[in-house]
């Protein structure tokens, strides 16, 4: 009797987290566009104050975790107890605002053992940020966007316990349309910032390695129908003027 065994080899592809997947730079984020501030009137432009923008800069609740695998679960839930968290100034780097991991300066050498697209897990610090806000009363029937001008090096965003999205690129803004996540009255915003991501391999420049929400954070409102992006083109004459 001859027994034939048929062996089927199944190749299982590893599922990478967004922060270790070179094919994913953002999830549910708005497409990159020209930078601008919306205004309701010429008078607002002349004053330099827009009623369509609401700053979220200031004191945020903050929790430092030495490695992403040590991150608490459900920290984004609205009923999660953050009474033991510290406060931190936004914008700002956490290395410069407390006894957290130190700033790192290196030129050619990576600040961690390179194994692209992977980054260390046990030594990849994260910062948990949280703050509450109320939407201005005159923002009715408009699209509401959340703008981060700069976060290093990657982040996840939750609003009122619901996951909004992900973004990595420490030098470019990130925007999310949060209209469907908002509720009447007070809203709770939670952000998880990762020190390292696969983007850190491309951002390995001759400069200080600092982390956190280091540029402005604000909300802005736009009408349902609006200009989202624009470009300006000009031609040069024969003298390149």
Can you name each region flagged by the protein language model?
Residues 1-14:
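Bacterial Sec-dependent N-terminal signal peptides
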Residues 14-26, 30, 46-47, 61-65, ...:
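Accessory beta-strand-rich segments of carbohydrate-active enzymes
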Residues 32-44:
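Short, contiguous pre-domain boundary segments
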Residues 47-64, 78, 87:
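Mature N-terminal segment immediately following signal peptide/propeptide cleavage
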Residues 71-82, 88:
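Short Gly/aromatic-enriched secondary-structure transition segments
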Residues 88, 92, 97-121:
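Surface-exposed, low-complexity/disordered Ser/Thr/Gly/Pro/Asn-rich loops and linkers
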Residues 236-241:
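Contiguous beta-strand segments within globular domains
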């Amino acid at each position: 009797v001859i027994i034939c065994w048929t062996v089927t080899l199944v190749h299982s592809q590893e599922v990478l987290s967004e922060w270790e997947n070179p094919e994913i730079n953002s999830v549910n984020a708005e497409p990159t566009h020209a930078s601008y501030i919306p205004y309701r009137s010429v008078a607002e432009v002349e004053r330099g104050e827009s009623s369509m923008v609401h700053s979220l800069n200031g004191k945020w609740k903050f929790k430092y975790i030495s490695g992403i695998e040590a991150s608490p679960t459900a920290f984004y839930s609205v009923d999660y107890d953050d009474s033991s968290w510290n406060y931190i100034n936004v914008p700002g780097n956490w290395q410069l605002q407390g006894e957290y991991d130190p700033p790192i300066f290196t030129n050619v050498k990576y600040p961690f053992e390179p194994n692209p697209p992977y980054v260390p897990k046990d030594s990849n610090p994260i910062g948990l940020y949280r703050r509450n806000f109320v939407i201005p009363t005159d923002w009715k029937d408009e699209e509401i966007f959340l703008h981060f001008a700069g976060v290093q090096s990657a982040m996840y965003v939750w609003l009122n316990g619901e996951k909004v999205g992900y973004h990595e690129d420490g030098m470019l803004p990130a925007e999310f349309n949060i209209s469907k996540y908002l509720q009447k009255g007070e809203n709770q915003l939670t952000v998880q910032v990762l020190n390292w991501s696969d983007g850190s391999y491309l951002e390995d420049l001759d400069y200080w390695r600092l982390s956190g929400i280091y540029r402005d954070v604000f909300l802005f409102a736009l009408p349902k129908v609006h200009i989202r992006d624009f470009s300006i083109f000009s031609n040069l004459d024969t003298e390149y003027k």
